[in-house]
Regions:
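Well-ordered beta-strand segments characteristic of repetitive beta-sheet solenoids
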Residues: 5-12, 25-32, 43, 47-57, ...
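Short, T/G/N/S-enriched strand-turn elements that build extracellular solenoid repeat scaffolds
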Residues: 1-2, 16-22, 37-43, 58-65, ...
């Protein structure tokens, strides 16, 4: 049936299999029942092509339907291995299913608006050169199916499922993509937009091995849960990524954006995963965050509010890694960083019920600001806590530092309770002031400070113990026994109401002063000053070791027994 003018067909049914219905003007088909255009059939119009009845059962399997513009109404459409093409706008309104599977192609040169009970596009192509809008109960674009639009795309499925697994592609070339569905299966599939990519998924979003991309816009995701494991990718190359979900699983996956806002009420799993932000402030609110063997990075602020943060490993080098411009964690539970790494380019603030940094490292590299740890227990055994910030503030119930190092290279306050310092063990170093007060202390650790002030009633230092000062060392107390090292690169002054004894060394590069009720120096003991040395003993001064001064040496005592060396250079 071929016409040069307008053509209209009204029938109860039409069998056009292997046939032709064609017009050089408008063509209108009003078919009450089945319209069969399969097996190479052709229906075409150079101008408007209209299927105007809602009850048409249209079979275009292996057939061709072409129009200058196309309005398609019907009960259902089977376009398997067929072609349905409009040179401009295409409107399709179906009460039942659209099947566009296999080698099928459904395309428009302008906007494409489709409404259907369901869409089966497995292996098919559904393409618009303009706007693409689909409203359906469900949509299956799996098995290398393609949904593509030149401009904005909108997929509205209500509570129905969107299937895009097995190399399915949903792509907005120059616009935004908006998806609303009950669930989304995007395993090994791709949803991509040049602009914003906005997904509202009521239930599970499975992106294992798949990609959710925004090339130049933002990635805005809401779902009941999100599985981005097994090499899945969430990518907002030039914009932010916002995620609101239940459980967010990024195990062995990649999530990256310019900035991140993640709210995962049931937790985040990032084992062997990569989660990063290239700039801006970033916030994560969750339950437990499992980063074992994973990487969490941000160029700007990384703020995390949650229950536990699990960053530990079984051995050195196997823990998780966290790096950010600034780190601020607030945890109701524990921070587990055994063999893990947390590093801030500026400030480091951690609040947790307990912190386990055994074998791990906590570092703040900025020269200003503060490092602040607020916790019940801090276990830093064989670990490293290092801060270049102005101030280091440790608010702890207990500190275990055996074999560990706490290093503060800033010049401000070293805030740690004296009781924690004397019980900690390991090495403690600060360029600032370290003020220790205790009634009794036995030291076998290494402590270093810019300025070291001690007020200790009874002090014992083993041969392994070292107390070191860069600028000044000031000590007060009762009875002191020193078998280790007391040293200052500046001045050193000790004022004791009791005695000073032992086989240890006390030395300064500047002036040295020691006043005590008595002095009893063993064979291996030494007192040495790089400038003047002043010694005062209210009672007996016994020297079996060495007492030397680069400048003047002044010693006064009620009684002096010298079996060693007394020497001054002044």
């Amino acid at each position: 049936l071929v016409s040069k003018g307008a053509q209209r067909i009204d029938a109860a049914s039409l069998d056009n299999a292997q046939g032709i219905v064609s017009g050089e003007s408008d063509v209108t088909l009003s078919i009450a029942g089945k319209l069969d255009n399969g097996q190479g059939g052709l229906v075409s119009a150079q101008r408007a092509l209209s299927f105007e009845r809602d009850d048409t059962l249209l079979n275009n399997a292996g057939g061709r339907i072409n129009g200058g513009s196309l309005l398609l109404k019907g009960a259902s459409l089977d376009n398997s291995d067929g072609q349905l093409i409009s040179q401009s706008r295409l409107d399709a309104i179906l009460g039942g299913a659209l099947v566009n599977a296999g080698a099928a192609r459904l395309a428009s040169g302008g906007d494409l608006l489709l409404r259907s009970a369901s869409v089966d596009n497995r292996g098919g192509k559904l393409v618009s050169q303009g706007l693409l809008e689909i409203s359906a109960g469900s949509l299956d674009n799996s098995a290398s199916g393609t949904l593509a639009g030149q401009a904005d795309m909108s997929l509205r499925l209500g509570g129905g499922a969107l299937r895009n697994q097995q190399d399915g592609l949903i792509f907005s070339q120059a616009g935004a993509l908006e998806v609303q569905a009950g669930s989304l299966d995007n395993r090994q599939g791709t949803l991509q937009a040049q602009g914003d990519n906005r997904l509202r998924i009521g239930g599970a979003l499975d992106n294992q091995g798949g990609r959710l991309d925004s090339r130049a816009g933002n990635l805005d995701l809401q779902s009941g849960s999100l599985d981005n494991g097994a090499g899945g990718v969430l990518n907002s190359a030039k914009g932010w990524l916002k995620l609101v979900t239940g459980l967010f699983d990024n195990s062995a996956g990649v999530t990256q954006a310019q900035s991140l806002e993640i709210r995962a009420g049931q937790g985040v799993r990032n084992q062997q995963g990569h989660l990063s932000a290239l700039g801006g402030d970033n916030r994560i609110v969750t339950a437990d965050f499992d980063n074992q063997g994973g990487g969490l990075y941000a160029s700007g602020l990384l703020s995390l509010d949650g229950q536990r943060f699990l960053n530990q490993g079984a051995a050195a080098g196997q823990g998780g890694k966290v790096g950010a411009g600034r780190i601020d964690f607030s945890l109701a539970g524990a921070l587990a960083n055994r063999f893990g790494q947390l590093e801030s380019e500026s400030e480091l603030h951690l609040r947790a019920a307990a912190i386990d940094n055994s074998g791990g490292s906590l570092r703040a590299l900025g020269r200003s600001g503060s490092t602040r740890l607020v916790a019940g227990d801090l276990n830093n055994a064989y670990g490293v806590l290092e801060s270049a910030n102005q101030d280091l503030d440790l608010q702890l119930s207990s500190l275990a530092n055996a074999g560990g190092r706490i290093l503060h290279t800033g010049n401000g306050t070293f805030g740690l309770d004296s009781g924690q310092v004397i019980r900690a063990g390991g090495e403690l170093t600060t360029n600032g002031l370290l003020d220790i007060r205790a009634s009794e202390w036995t030291n076998s650790s290494v402590l270093q400070a810019g300025r070291l002030n001690l007020d200790i009633g009874t002090f014992r230092q083993t041969a392994e113990g070292k107390l070191l000062a860069v600028q000044s060392f000031t000590g007060r107390g009762g009875d002191w026994s020193n078998d280790g090292l007391l040293a200052s690169d500046g001045s050193l002054r000790l004022d004791l109401s009791g005695g000073y004894r032992g086989n240890g060394r006390a030395t300064s590069l500047g002036d040295f002063a020691l006043n005590a009720a008595s002095l009893d120096l063993g064979n291996a003991a030494s007192l040495a000053g790089g400038a003047n040395v002043t010694l005062g003993a209210g009672n007996l001064l016994v020297n079996r070791g060495r007492i030397t001064a680069a400048g003047d040496l002044v010693a006064s005592a009620a009684s002096l027994n010298n079996y060693g060396t007394l020497g001054g250079g002044g």
